[in-house]
Amino acid sequence: MSTHAFQKKDEIRRGLIGVLLLVSIGLHTNRVDAQQSDPQPKAIAVGTSKVWGKVDGIVIEGLVQGPSSASTELQVACVFEYTEGDIFKSPPALPPPLNGMVHLDEALKGQITEIRKTGKFAGHAFEILLITPPAGTMKARKLLLIGLGDRDKFSPDLMISIGKVAMREALILGVNNFAFASDLKDAGIDSPTALVAGNVTKGIIEAYRTQAYLKAKKLSSFKPVTRVTLLAGPAFFSTAGEGIKNAIASFKN
């Protein structure tokens, strides 16, 4: 065999060895990545609830439930300014079986969509609308819609102020408890779940403390709120809970 042929054969052999090494390393890396990746979250059943903490006499609870099915004196639900079919286009919105806002709209025979589409409720940031649902349509006695404004300008920081609006309206209405649904995922907004839930919690507590301060100065009177239930979908319950617990802890330091 000529020297040239031998060198060529040796180059091919070394090349094959290199390829095999790369394949071996790749397989090993994939195994390590699989071992180190976060475990898949366990499926959380609808109806699951957990008390995440208590602040100033208010029990703050998480619940896997949609806003049309939660038993509460006041149900708070959030909506953006209307865009055609916004809660029904999946993706980005959650599919109808998992979309609490779709269920709420259906429970009220399409009236949520109707009042948004016709501009009767524009959904501008902090705009509110109080609805008394007909008997048997949903479990809450009252429904409060809070506007989130332009979806393209959404920031998680907004939810602190939205939480404040929710608590202030609850105190005005004199309810003992209320449930809150941000409905961001329902509307197709890929928001940071823990941060949003934590910000809502902060706003709720801050608003309550402000009113308590005014009451102590004899500048306000109100019936205490003793329970706030933050709703979450099955896939977001645990993550939301972490944000809620962190927010509660920040008021105890």
Q: What is each of the regions a protein language model found here?
A:
Residues 35-253:
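Glycine-/small-residue-enriched capping loops at alpha/beta junctions
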